[in-house]
Amino acid sequence: MGHRWSRLLVFLLAAVILSAAGIGQVKEAGRFGRLQEDTVKTGAFRRQTLDDGMQDMIRDMEDPGELLGIYWLETGFGEQPFSGNCTEQAFESMGRSWKRRPYWNVYAEACRVIWDDLVYFPIPVSKDGDAEEISFVDSWMYERNYGGTRGHEGTDIMAGENVRGYYPVVSMTDGYVTHKGWLEQGGYRLGITAPGGAYFYYAHLDSYAEIEEGDPVKAGDLLGFMGDTGYSKKEGTMGMFPVHLHVGIYLIHDGEEISVNPYQPLKYLENRRIECVYGRKN
């Protein structure tokens, strides 16, 4: 009888261990399942969700893209709290398992392309000491209705004073001018392709600096001035909405243009504002 109970206990213990191992394997498989061939096309990736702790960690980093890529995979793209230590050494350790997975290189490159070329916030501060107030919120995929219902693929930086042609707009990155001119929705706009390949879109400008398509730009170069142009097929239309700058960021993945949420990149840059002499308010 004693031997029978002993064998039964051993069997039950083994079953518990195997069950726990199986659950662990299922969880691990689910975790690694976050990294797929089309991960960068998903809404979860495109939202670019970050908590305040991660923003604090990357604030002084020059090339945060790969680290953020690991963070998103570990947290289900910000859906789960991050349980690790916010140190570069901890992320290096966590990254080892991800770097062995299929599709890591393509995914990590997308993260670097979005983040590693960022240098300056697009609205400078005034050299004369005046507090030129601006504000922005996370309005990613908020409903917009001009030309049909759609999601808002960008972030609007709102002018503290509703004065067109007053707030300078500078390039967030190095790069070259890919597009310049009028768009029905975007008004006067510029598109800058950064060295890594991301496309930075600046819309509703009042006017342009002396800049043309094909010109090289450096981060901090003047692109133009904030305005309220757009929402019309007629070039030059103004006043359909308050003065603001619409910022968009786009990737090219498998030949497809993919928008990503600029809000967290702008938060990362909000203390990196160059000084500039503002003109008179008209």
Task: Give residue spans per PLM region.
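Active-site scaffold segments
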Residues: 155-157, 218-219, 223-226, 244-250
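Zn2+-dependent peptidoglycan hydrolase active-site motif and core
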Residues: 170-207, 234-243
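N-terminal Sec-pathway targeting helices
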Residues: 1-14
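Surface-exposed, glycine-biased beta-strand/turn segments
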Residues: 28, 41-53, 67-188, 219, ...
